[in-house]
Amino acid sequence: MKLQIKSLYLLCFATGAMLLSSCEDFLDRQEDEKLTFEKIWESRNTTKQYWLNAMSFLPNYNGGFIGDNEPYLGASDECTITYDRGYRSMNFGSWNASNVPYYKMDKYYKGIRECNIFMQNVYKCSDPLATQEQLDEWYWQARFARAYYYFSMMCDYGPIFLIGDELLDFAASTEELYRPRNTWDECVNYVVGELTACAESNAVPVQKGLSTSKYGLATKGTCYAVISRLKLYSARDLFNGNALYRTVKNPVTDKFPELSGVNIFPQTYDANKWLEAAKAAKVLLDDTDYQLYRAGNGDPYEDYYGITHVNWNSELIWTDRYNNRFSWGVNTVPTGLPGTAYGGVGPTQQQVDAYAMNNGRYPITGYEASGDPIVDNASGYSKEEELQKSEWEYPAKGWSNYKNYNITAPNMYKDREPRFYITVFFGGNYWLHGDAKTMISFAKGGNGNKSHDYPKSGYLCNRFYDHTLNSGNGQWGNLTFPVFRLGE
């Protein structure tokens, strides 16, 4: 789990650097007192500060506004975001090589360089206060971070170039820095190999019995979770014999003959990659450190909501910090509520259609060429009555103290599975905030449809808001954002 340790990375290193590089006039230092590169490794404190700096390039999934740092929601088929951010240019195809939104390749290679420097020097630390156990821990956490930086780039750019232990000189010219990309399979094998080494190291902890002071470190489960996701990505059609990528090759170069002119994507489909992905996932399914979250009262709605509501619960493998819930809450709370509310992040209609009925059958099985949904009549969903309103009891009433929770809403939202009601908020329903509830309308002129902050699809995301608190009074609660969880 990755808690507030990452939020301390820059703070600790910046504070230490500030103390170590304070004005000479103020400290009246002698020339030989200046911190040199060699002196960093003489002190436990400065060695740790360098470690924190190397770790500070980890992605920030639970900070800033939704869509500010990552494109994965706004540019997806499952989510729609109102605000004008980089994902919009991706959705409209208006970006190009000169204007790449969310460009982070230089950031991650700088992070890789810092990890390499740290790993090559950490064992030079001569401070008796630095134990072998601490040095081992820092080394392997940095090695995990280096692998994760590669993984993050692969998520964004596909195949990238592997540099191993090389220290790139970012002051060099573009020509000197040029490296051809390794193939996709080479990248996968390298990252999987690095993460496997981390998972097998005695210095990388297991989750069970982990002290709270260690929350934030990558565990063995974290390593296997990244491996599982990467192998899943590698098995899917996008990276497994995709015809669109068969002509993508490295430029011909004499400087790197082994990669000159080679195809960087797999040329043929390999069904065995699905077996490898399944095996990687089973490692975590067999790990008794993690269990699917259960509220303990038999309520499936609370079981599902608790995954993102109960901090540090048993289903979470790795999280992004224990942080204030404001960012996720304020972007998903309807503008019809008092206090700060932006209400612009929600699921698309296709995502809403993907949820099953409470009998387990899926109502929408596909779409006609015209875009009209294909309905499974045996599911109980009626296309003729989907927009008709009727009064029915809202199933996820466990969030509230109200014994009777009846709403008048379209039948298309009636009798759906628990995950639907925990995730999807639709107009004509009450938004619960503490002991209060507010009826929300997304219709034109409604309290949830302002001129600029409103859900374009007519839906908001329900589950990342703490419905037990009243955001109108500035109460947002805290969140351990699930980067990897057992349920996936």
Predicted features along the sequence, with ranges:
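Short coil/turn linking the two alpha-helices of tandem helical-hairpin repeats
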Residues: 154-155, 161, 230-242
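Elongated scaffold/linker segments in the mid-to-C-terminal portions of large proteins
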Residues: 55, 62, 86-89, 93-103, ...
